């Protein structure tokens, strides 16, 4: 599972997930990409599940890039614990996603195969996504 090796602080505030993705909104590495259309959070487990779906479908062909990383800790208190007594411990890690963020990229496969693979990966994600091609200027 993806998570930072070390962080400056163990816990973070919840914060707000506003605006559109400025960075990471262009297809940089591969030929085709899966881009988010809605906003939300992706857990490390969801990112990994979609990655597995992609790699299984393309088999040995093609190269895959994961363009998101879960760097925000989410805390949770244990079951049946009363409120108060401080913040809970870190339960899992999430990546905050804004509309327009490229999630996965792929190269070395046909467009038809890439579309099928991204459709399988998108089914594992809690966001609305779209298929995009690299534009050459």
From Swiss-Prot:
Keywords: Ribonucleoprotein, Ribosomal protein, RNA-binding, rRNA-binding, tRNA-binding. Pfam families: Ribosomal_L16. GO terms for molecular function: rRNA binding; structural constituent of ribosome; tRNA binding. GO terms for biological process: translation. GO terms for cellular component: cytosolic large ribosomal subunit. Signal peptide: none annotated. Coiled coil: none annotated. SUPFAM superfamilies: Ribosomal protein L16p/L10e. HAMAP family: Ribosomal_uL16 (MF_01342). Belongs to the universal ribosomal protein uL16 family. Part of the 50S ribosomal subunit. NCBIfam families: rplP_bact. Binds 23S rRNA and is also seen to make contacts with the A and possibly P site tRNAs. This is Large ribosomal subunit protein uL16. It comes from Stutzerimonas stutzeri (strain A1501). The lineage of its organism: Bacteria, Pseudomonadati, Pseudomonadota, Gammaproteobacteria, Pseudomonadales.
